[in-house]
Amino acid sequence: MANISSIHILFLVFITSGIAVMATDFTLRNNCPTTVWAGTLAGQGPKLGDGGFELTPGASRQLTAPAGWSGRFWARTGCNFDASGNGRCVTGDCGGLRCNGGGVPPVTLAEFTLVGDGGKDFYDVSLVDGYNVKLGIRPSGGSGDCKYAGCVSDLNAACPDMLKVMDQNNVVACKSACERFNTDQYCCRGANDKPETCPPTDYSRIFKNACPDAYSYAYDDETSTFTCTGANYEITFCP
């Protein structure tokens, strides 16, 4: 065990070198009237919550991520798993109860990069992969802009017919134009791989008008990326 002097020296090293070791708590809450299954995927850092778990109506679960973590969260709907966690979901499927990758589009995403440039957290709600449920991100205890980010409109109700995903005569998700048409124009690739050559489309404007604070397409950064320093975050499905 380290003695008091060595602990004091270690503390001074962290302070004088400007290193802040902080963990961030995420609280995932289900306000939907039906059960959802949260999915998690890390781009950098450890897998959180074993990759996925069930949230009954009104339930919540807290996950803790280290500084430097990046990744995404989403809700899966219409899932059916056996005792071993094998099965599938109608929306947001990721290979089992504990996700083996990202959710199959269309799916609403909460995206984070913790302690990025300037020590800030970067976060957003993205509809780039389409939409399945309402979603909100609320920071707490941080400093800086720390604004609420979310898509709180029912895009399934406003989804154009050609983008609808149906299950048993119900609209369960709304595809992005990129997912539906798979062209450079809608996917911002090839000759359209820059903001100057990939402007908003009629389809992305439908998403943006419904959810002004969410990413509606790949280059929708200006009004859709939010920052906060030293915060914890509540991610609510169906806020």
From Swiss-Prot:
Signal peptide segment: 1-23
Which biological process terms from the Gene Ontology are attached to this UniProt entry? regulation of anthocyanin biosynthetic process; response to cadmium ion; response to UV-B; response to virus; systemic acquired resistance
UniProt keyword list: Apoplast, Disulfide bond, Pathogenesis-related protein, Plant defense, Secreted, Signal
Location of the protein in the cell: Secreted, Extracellular space, Apoplast
Source superkingdom: Eukaryota
Q: Which Pfam families match?
A: Thaumatin
Q: Which InterPro entries match?
A: Osmotin/thaumatin-like_sf, Thaumatin, Thaumatin_CS
The record's section on SMART domains has: THN
- Please provide, in alphabetical order, the Gene Ontology terms of the cellular component aspect for this entry: apoplast; mitochondrion; plant-type vacuole; secretory vesicle
GO MF terms held by the record: mRNA binding
PROSITE patterns recorded:
THAUMATIN_1 (PS00316), THAUMATIN_2 (PS51367)
- S-S bridge residues: C32-C238, C79-C89, C94-C99, C146-C228, C151-C211, C159-C174, C178-C187, C188-C198
Induction remark: By 2,6-dichloroisonicotinic acid (INA) and salicylic acid (possibly an endogenous signal for acquired resistance). Strongly induced by pathogen infection.
Q: What does this protein do?
A: Partially responsible for acquired pathogen resistance.
Q: Which family does it belong to?
A: Belongs to the thaumatin family.
Q: What is this protein called?
A: Pathogenesis-related protein 5
